[in-house]
């Protein structure tokens, strides 16, 4: 039986912290789907198309990882559609745990056959968040140490315009 997992997020933009979780999940599961979701609580900085492109470039080396765009639907519905029996969630800190525990409660109510697997972000990457990256971009500070090259290229393109 193939073990499939779904790792969801808005990835606005994808960070090295996200890639850390994706890489480690790729070793644990036969296939990892990255669910690129539109977060109704967040105003998108990069377009969905741009985020998908940056993600696909960043994960190119992982042969068992693919990106799916999913708007206006629940993660449990996407997981069922692709046959994923696991949600992968990254934890940077205790605030992430509180948020994720609440999310897991509702996911279990909707799909009790899907397990949530938590992966702690590597300590050197735990301070990195997409919102901090967007702040650095706004103030024209370098984001190179914190994001994949695909994001750096998009940021450089934006600054040229």
Swiss-Prot record:
Q: What is its main location?
A: cytoplasm
Question: What is any one of the record's Gene Ontology cellular component terms?
Answer: cytoplasm
Binding residues annotated for substrate, in chain numbering: 10, 42, 75, 89
Q: In which pathway does it act?
A: Cofactor biosynthesis; coenzyme A biosynthesis; CoA from (R)-pantothenate: step 4/5
Q: Name one GO molecular function term.
A: pantetheine-phosphate adenylyltransferase activity
Per the record, the domain of life is Bacteria
Q: What is its EC number?
A: 2.7.7.3
Q: Where, subcellularly, is it found? A: Cytoplasm
Kindly indicate whether the keyword Transferase belongs to this entry: yes
The protein's annotated catalytic reaction(s) are: (R)-4'-phosphopantetheine + ATP + H(+) = 3'-dephospho-CoA + diphosphate
**InterPro entries associated with the record:** Cyt_trans-like, PPAT, Rossmann-like_a/b/a_fold
Q: Does the keyword ATP-binding apply?
A: yes
Annotated ATP binding lies at 10-11, 18, 90-92, 100, 125-131
Q: Where is this site: Transition state stabilizer?
A: 18
An individual GO BP term: coenzyme A biosynthetic process
Q: Which SUPFAM superfamilies match?
A: Nucleotidylyl transferase
Cofactor(s) in the UniProt record: Mg(2+)
Which keywords are on file for this protein? ATP-binding, Coenzyme A biosynthesis, Cytoplasm, Magnesium, Nucleotide-binding, Nucleotidyltransferase, Transferase
Q: What does this protein do?
A: Reversibly transfers an adenylyl group from ATP to 4'-phosphopantetheine, yielding dephospho-CoA (dPCoA) and pyrophosphate.
PANTHER family (alphabetical): PHOSPHOPANTETHEINE ADENYLYLTRANSFERASE (PTHR21342:SF1)
Q: How does it assemble?
A: Homohexamer.
Q: Which NCBIfam families match?
A: coaD_prev_kdtB, cyt_tran_rel
Family of this protein: Belongs to the bacterial CoaD family.
Protein name stated in the entry? Phosphopantetheine adenylyltransferase
Q: Which organism is it from?
A: Streptococcus agalactiae serotype III (strain NEM316)
């Amino acid at each position: 039986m193939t073990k499939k997992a779904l790792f969801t997020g808005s990835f606005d933009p994808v960070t090295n912290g996200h890639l850390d979780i994706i890489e480690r999940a790729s070793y644990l599961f036969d296939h990892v789907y990255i669910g690129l979701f539109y977060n109704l609580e967040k105003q998108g900085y990069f377009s969905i198309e741009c985020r998908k492109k940056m993600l696909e470039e960043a994960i190119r080396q992982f042969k068992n990882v693919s990106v799916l765009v999913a708007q206006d639907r629940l993660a449990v519905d996407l997981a069922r559609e692709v046959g994923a029996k696991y949600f992968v969630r990254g934890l940077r800190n205790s605030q992430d745990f509180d948020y994720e525990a609440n999310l897991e409660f509702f996911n279990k109510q909707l799909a009790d056959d899907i397990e949530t697997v938590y992966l702690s972000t590597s300590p050197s990457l735990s301070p990195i968040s997409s919102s901090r990256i967007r702040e650095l971009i706004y103030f024209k500070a370098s984001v190179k140490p914190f994001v994949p090259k695909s994001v750096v290229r998009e940021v450089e393109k934006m600054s040229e315009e």
